[in-house]
């Protein structure tokens, strides 16, 4: 991004926390950034930048757009937290020029909850894939089957179900291995080290170019709990790799069932294993 001429401004954010003090700090940080750089337009991504960035733009009278890349776990539950998020989204979305969605179900949820005027809603069907960068790759001929996971290693990505399914395969003496790419949440550091020693997982950290790993993979796996539109599914499909992914909006669109891949139940390691 820097090579393209972009200016990078780091904004510390607690992605999963609900501490009001921390979130107010983020809001005022956004306000100060807007005051300093005076942008013509702001495009916000993900829940906290959408909400607090949107509110900061309203306060500073800056034009802005929201991009809903997924609704997160809070939208799948009932209770005070969901009600609060819906209320904040309504405030943040009120003056937005447009609200982009990456799948129809997320847009439908916003319509049902009447978060903003429907005239603002635009469906993108994902961020898209550069098919010259992710072109068809010959299928590997290795005897050992390589499953591939790319993403943040966290509970909501379905990694617990994935690890359970892989352990079951490995216990049956199947000749397979799971290649894992991405940063991990603190809870998973010890687990990853343990599974590597057991021999069925290889952790490669964050990779700026995933193509060598996609080329080696026999199958891409993403058992996520929720997604906007999973680009890693699209990139793997564009490269000619079968996919196993969750039967949820944002994942299932990338698969023709039993032809280009398989769909599994969300939060179900047995379904994933089968």
Where are these regions (language model features)?
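Short, structured helix-loop element that forms part of the nucleotide-activated donor/catalytic region
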Residues: 1-4, 108, 168-171, 177-204
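Donor nucleotide-sugar binding/catalytic pocket of nucleotide-sugar-dependent glycosyltransferases
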Residues: 9-10, 90-136
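Nucleotide-sugar donor phosphate/pyrophosphate-binding loop at the beta->alpha transition
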Residues: 21-28, 63-65, 73-95
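Short His-centered aromatic/hydrophobic patch
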Residues: 44-50, 68
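Conserved donor-binding/catalytic core segment of Leloir-type glycosyltransferases
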Residues: 138-157, 162-167
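Aromatic "clamp/platform" in nucleotide-sugar-dependent glycosyltransferases that forms part
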Residues: 206, 225
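Short hydrophobic beta-strand element within catalytic cores of glycosyltransferases
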Residues: 242-245, 255
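Conserved acidic donor-binding segment of nucleotide-sugar-dependent glycosyltransferases
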Residues: 257-258, 262-269
